[in-house]
């Protein structure tokens, strides 16, 4: 089958996968791989989870799409589950993380217009951040390599140093409409925000009548050991953006907000064609029931996180090539003092899938229901790659 028809926008590994089950992937020749990428934090319950497969089969034979001119029960049920398991009151449904970010940015601008003045438009973002590749999300992504070819981007945006208390104090002002931050910088190298930094952001936003937006696209939906990442940091934003694991492999995203903020939107302010469709929502409901009702997040993530961290710290003590082990839950970065791509490629050759984050960080993103045995097998391969 020809590869020539796909646009050249990704640097792909030389493998074509044909089947998946749990933490395993199989290529077209039947070779088995351990997947510690999880579709980049998407396949939170592994591949072809029975609950997800059942939801797709049942809903796809009943109703898949009706548009947002009409109500559908699955969208109502999903948004109720999300709100009842968070501090938020309203949900905007979409299809991806970058769409959720765009929705959050637009809501912040509309809120500022209604509750500030015409000059209150500024969005503050973090250096080294990543929020997506659409124009709005790209404009608040603090990595020039993604931005340079697409300037001019949207105006009235300003960057600050991540985790630097003094810098944000100096740059936030009455003109600031919102501050957007990842509780854990993912693409930037798995760098957690300091709790005191997020608390300061909350206080400064309140003082300046600005909104605080958390991008939990990668770190949310159970990945760090709580359903929402903000719950671990004990700082509640005004807006939170989620996607990836929400669909467990099926495209879906959402932007959640408090009623006082969400009410700024009126019909026509924002929308999309597929957001909240019955099929995607049925899948997300199935995912959340596994994560919450069956306590995958509460029990498995926290147990396996401690186990994986402890094992990686042992490797750090044993091998000088490991500079740091950091992260939270099952979002873990191992910073190395060598060419990180060589490690990734060695693991790939030994049938373990890992990816990079930042310049020299190996990113571990196993399914949230990963077993101790699968962790041991993956770490055995990883250790061989760093010897």
UniProtKB/Swiss-Prot annotation:
Its main location: cytoplasm. Keywords: Amino-acid biosynthesis, Aminotransferase, Arginine biosynthesis, Cytoplasm, Pyridoxal phosphate, Transferase. CDD domains: OAT_like (cd00610). It is found in: Cytoplasm. It is an enzyme of class 2 (transferase). GO terms for biological process: L-arginine biosynthetic process. May also have succinyldiaminopimelate aminotransferase activity, thus carrying out the corresponding step in lysine biosynthesis. Homodimer. Belongs to the class-III pyridoxal-phosphate-dependent aminotransferase family. ArgD subfamily. This is Acetylornithine aminotransferase. It comes from Clostridium acetobutylicum (strain ATCC 824 / DSM 792 / JCM 1419 / IAM 19013 / LMG 5710 / NBRC 13948 / NRRL B-527 / VKM B-1787 / 2291 / W).
